[in-house]
């Protein structure tokens, strides 16, 4: 058994100190999952369906804001091939990550919003600006997207009491 020593640091909002080593590990993991999201956006921009698929686990599930569901690389490849070759041809996809939560050391849940600009889809659809939740899983040291669940943005209307 080895003795390990850690610096303890206080993070605003937490009631107990956190090991500095754990914080550094979480920052590295966060950078890694954000890199996958950036690679996904870059592949979309390039119209590179194989690049999009490379960001996903082989058994990934994608649910689009239009309600399309694709399971596994082949269905996802077909879905993105039709979409990026059709109504979203020449479009850009920009993700803004709102929150990253590590459920375990190897599972991350990301909440964000995406904006699709350019192409017929963006011009004609209210779904061009939507929210999403991605689940990423690390296997063999590599982070990949296991689930994409995109959904329409909505606004809550507050009733006025008269």
Where are these regions (language model features)?
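A beta-strand edge to alpha-helix "cap/lid" segment located at domain peripheries
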Residues: 2-54, 61-162
């Amino acid at each position: 058994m080895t003795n390990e020593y850690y610096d303890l640091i206080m993070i605003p909002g937490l009631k107990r100190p956190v090991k500095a080593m754990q914080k550094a590990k979480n920052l590295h993991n966060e950078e890694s999952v954000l890199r996958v999201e950036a690679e996904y956006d870059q592949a979309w921009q390039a119209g590179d369906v194989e690049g999009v698929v490379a960001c996903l686990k082989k058994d990934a599930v994608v649910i689009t804001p239009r309600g399309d569901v694709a399971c596994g690389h082949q269905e996802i490849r077909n879905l993105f091939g039709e979409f990026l070759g059709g109504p979203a041809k020449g479009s850009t996809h920009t993700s803004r990550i709102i929150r990253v939560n590590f459920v375990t050391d190897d599972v991350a849940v990301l909440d964000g919003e995406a904006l699709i600009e350019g192409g017929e889809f963006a011009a004609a659809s209210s779904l061009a600006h939507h929210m999403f939740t991605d689940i990423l899983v690390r296997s063999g040291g590599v982070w990949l997207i296991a689930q994409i669940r995109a959904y329409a943005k909505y606004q809550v209307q507050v009733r006025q009491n008269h």
